[in-house]
UniProtKB/Swiss-Prot annotation:
InterPro entries attached to this UniProt entry: FAD/NAD-bd_sf, GIDA_C_N, MnmG, MnmG-rel, MnmG-rel_CS, MnmG_C, MnmG_C_subdom, MnmG_C_subdom_sf
Source superkingdom: Bacteria
GO MF entry, a single one: flavin adenine dinucleotide binding
Protein name: tRNA uridine 5-carboxymethylaminomethyl modification enzyme MnmG
Keyword Phosphoprotein: no
Subunit structure: Homodimer. Heterotetramer of two MnmE and two MnmG subunits.
Binding site for FAD: 13-18
Binding residues annotated for NAD(+), in chain numbering: 282-296
Cited PANTHER family: GLUCOSE INHIBITED DIVISION PROTEIN A, PROTEIN MTO1 HOMOLOG, MITOCHONDRIAL
Family the UniProt entry places it in: Belongs to the MnmG family.
Entries under SMART domains matching the protein: GIDA_assoc_3
Requisite cofactors: FAD
Length: 623
């Protein structure tokens, strides 16, 4: 075949997964193309105008630790910043920000258009070419005419694959409102026998701010000082709070009423969801308002957050009110809510159905098991959220570039990052509904905190080529400083009087007390670090040292299994002691390590022992 263009890596889709995939690939020095229908819509926020949230905000900081862009973008374009769960322990805290969605989009458009090694090509990816007589990527077709050769292809099509919008009984083929769906690419997947699942999500109407009465509503301001997402924003200041405070725009809170619920109940049969038009599975943790009314019928009211979509614009996003009701019923429903009695809808709410490929079709590198050099990321893997998509995009983009360079693939383990937890969940367990990340999904959540992503990941990022030497040395120095102060606090002692007795106590032991932090050590005659960030890390490390030790021991056991690799060509039917069911599951899943195999549903400890014995036999035979 004659190709018109040639790139090392081609990324299909300019959403949040596609952006991080393309930027990561380009950063590793390979010639990269990003194919998108409209370059001016790169980085668009089609649903909520926000970045972060529980676990999701930590993912953004992990992306940043690998040199990704999402954290920098939201720091530059956010209009309200909060830290969630501040009254709880450090394991569950997480940053969240309201974005000026137009400024965020412009930031990302500018970034992809001005990145070395990256070219943006407008058009629809209509086919993926394979090498003759093999299941290996060779190129991509655009608009049924342009042929692009590629060593690796990353598919990040979001909700576009055979996407259909539902508003009441209206059915509109679309990938997003006013954007055509991808109808050609699904043929490639069907032809190769990839299974497809049908998922559904939705978005609320957009409201005209000028027609809302905010006077009786509860104001929800941002935090002061405002948290930030990128370690490198104001780096000379406290590492997770801004030096230069930005003006923050408040959100407002209102609630549904019994009248709201009556309108919805009387029109349930007219919704696409309950009227039978939608067959796709919707997100459990972000249900439509009609779903809430049905499933929580005894609840008197549901919270609605009124979130500005831009700093100076008129559009308000009513978080909590997505629906597939007919448009005329939507007007009635929205106007039954306090503050919205005279509201004007700028755009109607809608539900959208789309196809995904089950993520069990992927290795933990996000490469497909059926086709070499083909990677998937984002909603196409069955996840929800910009942050989950971006995290997958980063991993897929790095691995696509490494493959093009002929290098070994890259993995993130469960104990290293929430990105690793998510990818392991997806590729091991699969999805029966849109997947959302929570801190509760991780057994290592005390280690995977919001304050330490760069400390956890900077060495791995630097070794990959995703961080500069200057960045590496900056973080290394912080890590060394934390270690120095911990040594000082273990060894330095002061005499204190307690219950009439004088005794010698180390700073380390004092810090174990819940009422004493690093700053309070001054009262006992100890010196303290200048950096607030170093002080915070010391405080957490000491107070939770017992829990960390427990996590470390558990981690050692799991890492032992993770380090035992399983050959790609292994024949499980030849392993004594495995049942037929176990053989079928292992053959389908193709686990890369014994740890991966151990996490598969239905794989018993006895089966893992049998595989380990078999691998030891193979090793002896080769010796």
């Amino acid at each position: 075949m004659v190709y018109d263009l040639e790139y090392d890596v081609v990324v299909i889709g300019g959403g949040h997964a596609g952006i991080e995939a393309a930027l990561a690939s380009a950063k590793l020095g390979v010639k990269t193309a990003l194919i998108t229908l409209d370059k001016e819509k790169v980085g668009l926020m089609p649903c909520n105008p926000a970045i972060g949230g529980i676990a999701k905000g930590i993912v953004v900081r992990e992306i940043d630790a690998f040199g990704g862009e999402m954290g920098k973008a939201i720091d530059a374009t956010g209009i309200q910043f909060k830290t969630l769960n501040t009254r709880k322990g450090p394991a569950v805290r997480s940053p969240r920000a309201q974005a000026d969605k137009e400024e965020y989009r412009k930031y990302m458009v500018n970034k992809v258009l001005n990145t070395e090694n990256l070219t943006v090509i407008e058009g629809e990816a209509t086919d993926i070419y394979l090498k003759e007589s093999s299941y290996e990527v060779e190129g991509v077709e655009v608009d049924r005419r342009l042929k692009i050769r590629a060593k690796s292809v990353v598919v990040t099509t979001g909700t576009f694959l055979d996407g259909v919008i539902h508003i009441g009984d209206k059915r509109i083929p679309a990938g997003r409102m006013d954007e055509k769906p991808s109808t050609k690419l699904p043929d490639f997947y069907r032809k190769l026998g990839f299974p497809l699942q049908r998922f559904k999500t939705g978005t609320p109407a957009r409201l005209d701010k000028r027609t809302i009465d905010f006077s009786g509503l509860e104001e929800a301001p941002g935090d002061e000082p405002a948290p930030k997402f990128s370690f490198w924003t104001d780096p000379e200041h406290s590492y997770w709070f801004r030096k230069n405070q930005k003006e923050q725009i408040p959100c407002y809170i209102t609630y549904t009423t019994p009248e709201t619920h009556r309108i919805i109940r009387e029109n349930l049969h007219r919704t696409a969801l309950y009227g039978g038009a939608i067959k796709g599975i919707g997100p459990r943790y972000c249900p439509s308002i009609e779903d809430k009314i049905v499933k929580f019928e005894n609840k008197e009211r549901h919270t609605v957050w009124l979130e500005p979509e831009t700093k100076n614009g008129i559009s308000i996003y009513p978080n909590g009110l997505s629906t597939s009701l007919p448009e005329e019923v939507q007007w009635e429903m929205y106007r039954s809510i306090p503050g919205l009695e005279n509201v004007v809808l700028l755009k109607p709410a809608y539900a959208i159905e789309y196809d995904i490929v089950p993520p069990t079709e992927l290795y933990p590198t996000l490469e497909t098991k059926r086709v070499k050099g083909l990677y998937h990321a984002g909603n196409f893997n069955g996840t929800t959220g910009y942050e989950e998509a971006a995290g997958q995009g980063l991993v897929a983009g790095i691995n696509a570039a490494l493959r093009a360079l002929g290098k070994e693939p890259f993995y993130i383990r469960r104990d290293e990052a929430y990105i690793g937890v998510m990818i392991d969940d997806l590729t091991t367990k699969g999805v029966i509904e849109p997947y959302r990340l929570f801190t509760s999904r991780s057994e290592y959540r005390l280690h995977l905190r919001q304050d330490n992503p760069v400390l956890r990941l900077y060495r791995k990022a630097y070794n990959l080529g995703m961080l500069s030497y200057e960045q590496f040395k900056a973080v290394e120095e912080i890590e060394k400083e934390i270690g120095r102060w911990l040594d000082i606090y273990r060894n330095e002692r002061r005499k204190i009087v307690s219950k009439g007795e004088t005794r010698s106590v180390s700073a380390y032991d004092l810090l174990k007390r819940p009422d004493i932090d690093v700053n309070k050590l001054k009262e006992y005659g100890f010196e303290t670090p200048e950096s607030d960030y170093v002080a915070e890390e010391i405080d957490i490390n000491v107070k939770y040292s017992g829990y960390f030790e427990r996590e470390r021991k558990m981690n050692e056991k799991m890492r032992y299994l993770e380090n035992i690799k399983i050959p790609e060509d292994i024949d499980y039917s030849q392993i004594a002691g495995l049942t037929k069911e176990v053989v079928q599951k292992l053959t389908a899943a193709k686990p890369l390590t014994l740890g991966h195999a151990a996490r598969l549903e239905g794989i018993t400890p006895a089966a893992i022992t049998a595989i380990m014995i078999h691998l030891q036999k193979l090793k002896r035979l080769k010796a």
